[in-house]
Structure formats: structure tokens, C-alpha cells
């Protein structure tokens, strides 16, 4: 009995799991000035809260909601994961489809006040479904793939004969990470297929990224769309009152005429996002307490370059942004 007790205790120590849920979040509040038309607006852009934890050494869960996404409440993520091994896991629920790099950046680690056109307009897909992911033990290589409902995340009751699909492959070589992927969505009457390629380079204080995305619409329902983004971020330690890090950012992004692949009343696709380019310059001073706890004070200036056929609206005008971000 003593031997059994000792063996049992040893197994418990080896299999010790922290079951206490972790709560994290990000609050982004800002003022924007339209420098072209002289208008202002105040926003709570995000009030995001997440809850995650372990059920066992081989299973965990994650739930995330945004209490104020531009004034609206949204349930973003709700999934459970099973990990048969250190290299393999299966995940089911509602979450972001495994496709792209820019789109996976969350509010707590944004480098710019406004997301790129690629991350916000062209590839901003969460869906209900399941995926599998595998990372090779002896190679810096990983792959993810999943099947999803083609319906919007707010509709979990509809039946469909179609599915959406997404996949992602990444490879790391020294300081660079190369990623490519394929996604196929069917949110309305027309299926759209997307391909993506990106490279991320990190060394010392520098972080540089470039990404390209292409979207093709079945049956030539809309002209194919292209999107691209490239940016650089440079950080340095400082001692300025309570702040301890200063960083500078530069970005150039663009998108051609793009449709969300949702048909109008006449059954035809419309152009939801007009063609445009943008250059963004920014600076951020931060208080970094831990990896997940900190405060950012960010200022950005965005210069828009519109095509002749694109009308100037407040959202497409040059703007300055002052933003305060709390991360916990």
C-alpha cells in the first residue's frame, strides 16, 4: 500500500496541471481627427476580455468576447482543444480560420491604431468548425487545416450543403518565418478562393513583415482582388516617467476593388471596399510590466491615396489618431 501510494504521488507530480483559469484583456480608447474634412470622433474601439484554462494536461479551452467593439458586443472565440501529443492538437468551436498572418494580430499586440486593409476588410474571418494542427519535432515546420460552416458567426442554426476550408503552412529559417495558405469561403451565392504568402523577419530591435493576398471569385462574379501590406517596427528601451519602451512604426498597405462575396438583392456581388492605398507613420511609448500587462500611448498619421473613381468619405480621408491601450 505504501509503494502504491508513493507511485501514485509521483504520477500526480509529473501530471501536475494548473486548473486555475487565466483572465486577460485589452482596452483601446482613442480620438481620431479627419485632417481632410476637419471632423473628430471618440471611440472605445475594443474592450476585449478572454478566459482560458486547462481541463487536463492534454485538453484546454478558451472563450473571448468584445464588450465594446465600436459600441457593439460580440462573442469572438469559444473553443476546446485536445492535444494527443506535443506536436498535434485538434480544436473545435468558434475561432479565426487558419489563414493569413496579419489577420491573427490581436488588439493587445497591435502595432498601429488601425488594422491593415488586408486584416480588416479582405481577410477577417471567424467561423464555427474544427481544425487540426501539427508541428514537426525535428523541423521548424508547421501546418494547420480545418473545415468550417460557411454561415456568419452569429448564425449557428442554419443548415448548408457547402463548407468553408482554410489551411496554413509555415517554415522558420533563422530570423525569418515564411507562411503560405489557401482558403475557400462561401458566405452567399458565390464561392471565393484566397491564397496568401508572407514573410516575417525579426532581429534585435527590428520587426519587419510583408504579406500578399489574392482573392478569386467563382464564375467571374467579381473582378479578382489583391491586397498587400509591408511594415517595420523598431523598439528601444527608455526611461521617461513611468514608461520604459519607445517604438517607431512605418507601414504601406493597399487593396484593389474588393467584394465580401455576399450578394446584393439582385443576386450580384457588389464592391464593398474601393481600391486605395495608405501610408502610416507612428510612434508608441509603453509601460511594460510583464508580457501580458502593460500600457501603450500611440500616435499615428495615415495618408490615403485614392483611385479617381473612389469618393472621399470620412473613413477614407487622411487622419491622425491618438490612442491609449491597456493590456492585462
Feature annotation, model-predicted:
Residues 35-37, 56, 81-83, 103-105, ...:
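Outer-membrane beta-barrel pore domains
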Residues 15-153, 161-165, 169-177, 231, ...:
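Outer membrane beta-barrel
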Residues 17, 41, 72, 122, ...:
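A generic structural micro-feature
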Amino acid at each position: 500500500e505504501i509503494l502504491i501510494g508513493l507511485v501514485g504521488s509521483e504520477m500526480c507530480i509529473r501530471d501536475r496541471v494548473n486548473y486555475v483559469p487565466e483572465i486577460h484583456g485589452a482596452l483601446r480608447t482613442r480620438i481620431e481627427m479627419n485632417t481632410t474634412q476637419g471632423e473628430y470622433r471618440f471611440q472605445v474601439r475594443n474592450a476585449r476580455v478572454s478566459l482560458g484554462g486547462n481541463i487536463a494536461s492534454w485538453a484546454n479551452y478558451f472563450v473571448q468576447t468584445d464588450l465594446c467593439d465600436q459600441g457593439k458586443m460580440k462573442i469572438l472565440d469559444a473553443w476546446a482543444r485536445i492535444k494527443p501529443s506535443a506536436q498535434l492538437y485538434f480544436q473545435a468551436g468558434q475561432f479565426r480560420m487558419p489563414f493569413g498572418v496579419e489577420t491573427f494580430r490581436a488588439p493587445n499586440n497591435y502595432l498601429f491604431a488601425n488594422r491593415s486593409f488586408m486584416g480588416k476588410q479582405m481577410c477577417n474571418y471567424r467561423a464555427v468548425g474544427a481544425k487540426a494542427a501539427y508541428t514537426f519535432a525535428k523541423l521548424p515546420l508547421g501546418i494547420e487545416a480545418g473545415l468550417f460552416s460557411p454561415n456568419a458567426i452569429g448564425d449557428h442554426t442554419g443548415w448548408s450543403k457547402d463548407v468553408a476550408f482554410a489551411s496554413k503552412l509555415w517554415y522558420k529559417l533563422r530570423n525569418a518565418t515564411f507562411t503560405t495558405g489557401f482558403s475557400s469561403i462561401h458566405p452567399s451565392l458565390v464561392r471565393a478562393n484566397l491564397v496568401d504568402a508572407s514573410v516575417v523577419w525579426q532581429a534585435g530591435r527590428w520587426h519587419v513583415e510583408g504579406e500578399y493576398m489574392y482573392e478569386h471569385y467563382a464564375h467571374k462574379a467579381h473582378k479578382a482582388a489583391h491586397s498587400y501590406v509591408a511594415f517595420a517596427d523598431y523598439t528601444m528601451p527608455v526611461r521617461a516617467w513611468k514608461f520604459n519602451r519607445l517604438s517607431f512604426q512605418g507601414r504601406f498597405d493597399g487593396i484593389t476593388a474588393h467584394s465580401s462575396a455576399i450578394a446584393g438583392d439582385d443576386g450580384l456581388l457588389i464592391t464593398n471596399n474601393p481600391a486605395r492605398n495608405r501610408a502610416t507613420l507612428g510612434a508608441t511609448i509603453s509601460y511594460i510590466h510583464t508580457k501580458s500587462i502593460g500600457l501603450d500611448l500611440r500616435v499615428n498619421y495615415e495618408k490615403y491615396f485614392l483611385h479617381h473613381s473612389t469618393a472621399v468619405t470620412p473613413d477614407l480621408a487622411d487622419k491622425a489618431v491618438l490612442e491609449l491601450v491597456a493590456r492585462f
